[in-house]
Regions:
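A positional "C-terminalness" feature that preferentially activates on distal terminal regions of long
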Residues: 1-359
């Protein structure tokens, strides 16, 4: 509803309403960010408040006279920050416009040399962006320690050679540092104000280098086995079905950002999964029929996973992730039993997990 009582849009989906109402919803959310720094415009288009139950951030609501009937709200330029100078950041916030309520999830956005605050309609999307924004803000406040770290990652040049099929040495270095920042400073619950942010910096600074060295060693172990698996696949002259299956597995495990994209617990298992590929190829010539039988059992399990991933269009799903890593353990059980699995795994176990996901 606008200031004259005309209905502009209904519903609680922020994305749809933002698309329908154009800059009006965006301007109202940006007004909230402006309020944090005392730079709010004189006449915001709506009341803006943190949602009930979220952390307070000082004065979070504003009411102002509406713009003239003929004037549409101008979108506000995002405010740039290089330090935590914007008060508390709530997990979610609301704007109210003539009885219409929109719920949004604020996040820090990485802009390279600065961060900005934006509001998302989906909490999962906000969480991903917010972590990246927090990492950037940390980096901007840890310039000297990071300058030292960039020059002292162990065996970086050697790792970069094995990383060449995936990316550059600089991309490898960036991933190692990003994960080191995550593990040193960004354990849950995440900092929500300047005091907790500074406390994280003080706590994590002393262990940053040790954590980065640990990550680099693990990345090196993964890349060593990746190179060996690639060589063995090239030399094995495996049947097309097997070669295609292994190539797809390697692509899943070893994306360009495998260090940053793989959870730390699973990153420690990647060398074993890659060694399992090598053992599978070693055994293939001796018993191709057994390999074909196991592959036939795997295919329907992986096909349903692939379909669900496509349906989610990038949205995170913890249970689907669990299923994905169980498939890797099943491959070890099928093709490289001597490497062992940390827990019993079978097709029945995966079917049970899938059934629980579908409930």
């Amino acid at each position: 509803v606008d200031e004259h009582g005309r209905q502009l849009g209904t519903g609680r989906n922020l994305a749809a309403l933002k698309a329908e109402l154009g800059g009006q919803a965006r301007s109202a959310f940006q007004a909230l960010a402006a309020l944090k720094t005392g730079t709010a415009p004189a006449a915001p288009a709506a009341a803006v408040t943190p949602a009930p139950g979220t952390a307070p951030a000082g004065s979070r609501s504003a009411k102002a006279s509406p713009p003239p009937p003929s004037a549409a709200p101008e979108p506000l330029a995002p405010q740039a920050y290089t330090a935590w100078t914007f008060g508390e950041l709530p997990e979610l916030m609301e704007i109210r416009k003539a009885g219409q309520t929109l719920i949004g999830f604020p996040a820090l956005i990485d802009r390279g040399t600065q961060v900005e605050i934006e509001v998302f309609d989906e909490p999962a999307a906000a969480a991903v962006k917010h972590r990246a924004g927090l990492r950037r803000l940390l980096a901007l406040n840890l310039k000297e320690p990071l300058k030292y770290l960039e020059k002292n990652i162990p065996d970086l040049q050697k790792m970069a050679v094995a990383f060449m099929p995936l990316g550059t040495q600089e991309e490898l270095r960036t991933q190692i540092i990003d994960v080191a920042l995550e593990r040193a400073f960004l354990a849950e619950p995440l900092p929500h104000d300047a005091a907790s942010f500074q406390a994280r910096i003080d706590e994590g600074r002393t262990r940053l280098n040790l954590i980065a060295q640990e990550i680099a060693r693990q990345a090196g172990a993964v890349l060593l086995e990746f190179a060996a698996a690639q060589r063995k696949l090239k030399d094995a002259r495996a049947p097309k079905d097997v070669a295609d299956d292994i190539a797809a597995q390697l692509q899943r495990l070893m994306g360009k950002r495998f260090i940053a994209a793989t959870p730390w617990a699973q990153l420690q298992h990647l060398p074993r999964y890659l060694k399992g590929v090598q053992l599978r190829l070693d055994k293939l010539r001796g018993d191709p029929a057994r390999d074909a039988q196991r592959l036939a059992e795997l295919r329907p399990l992986e096909q349903r996973w692939s379909r669900r991933v496509a349906e989610l269009k990038g949205a995170p799903d913890a249970r689907l992730d669990e299923y994905r890593w169980l498939m890797e353990e099943l491959r070890i059980s099928f093709f490289a039993q001597e490497l062992k699995t940390p827990q019993p795994v079978s097709t029945k176990r995966l079917d049970k997990v899938w059934a629980q996901m579908s409930m």
